[in-house]
């Protein structure tokens, strides 16, 4: 069931572009492209997806397939992120897309992260506008792995900051330093979801590089 504010958001924006030029990609020989967003460093030929399922080689360029594609939109207590000492007692606007660069067998959001859920297009500025309209002090990128939708998260986080909305990132932390450092000035709080305690387990169980 959609709440009135969710219907309003989806009705206003409807469908939009399904491809967006990806950042942190390197063109290689024979039309292949190498992604430098996360440690997988996927090298893909024309029409092939990265391991995250959200980035693809299209005409010799890496594109983001989930830019603005919101699959889950909700209003949560900030403690559900879970954050205990950041703006306690407040609600946060939570948004997620699809795709993940890990493959944990115990993922509670597997249908979102690795499936093909229905989505609606919401431009980056739409998230800040919705948070302000609903009088919610923060915006959370959650549900799936936000880093595999880096371009939209980056744009939405910047516009949220400009609107005075706090930004929360719920992530597995599996990202390269350069893109993370570029995003951090627009992030107010972060929950890095620890999946395992050893590199071996990350590789053999969680699908890390």
What annotation goes with each model-predicted range?
Residues 4-90:
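Flexible, acidic/Gly-rich N-terminal and inter-domain linker regions that tether
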Residues 206-209:
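Glycine-rich S-adenosyl-L-methionine
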Residues 57-190, 198:
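Conserved Radical SAM active-site core
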Residues 195:
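Cell-envelope and extracellular/periplasmic
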């Amino acid at each position: 069931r959609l709440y009135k504010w969710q219907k309003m958001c989806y009705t206003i924006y409807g469908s939009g572009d399904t491809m967006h030029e990806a950042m942190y990609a390197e063109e290689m020989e024979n039309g292949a492209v190498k992604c430098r967003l996360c440690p997988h460093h996927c090298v893909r030929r024309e029409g092939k997806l990265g391991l995250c399922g959200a980035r693809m080689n299209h005409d010799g360029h890496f594109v983001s397939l989930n830019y603005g594609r919101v699959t889950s939109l909700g209003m949560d207590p900030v403690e559900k992120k879970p954050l205990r000492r950041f703006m306690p007692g407040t609600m946060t606007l939570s948004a997620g897309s699809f795709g993940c660069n890990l493959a944990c067998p115990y993922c509670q959001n597997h249908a979102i992260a690795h499936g093909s859920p229905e989505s609606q297009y919401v431009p980056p500025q739409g998230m800040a506008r919705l948070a302000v309209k609903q009088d919610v002090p923060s915006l959370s990128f959650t549900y799936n792995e936000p880093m595999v939708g880096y371009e939209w998260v980056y744009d939405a986080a910047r516009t949220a900051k400009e609107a005075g909305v706090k930004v929360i990132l719920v992530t597995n932390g599996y990202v390269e330093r350069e893109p993370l450092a570029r995003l951090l000035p627009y992030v107010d709080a972060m929950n890095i979801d620890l999946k395992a305690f050893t590199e071996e387990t990350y590789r053999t169980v969680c699908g890390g590089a």
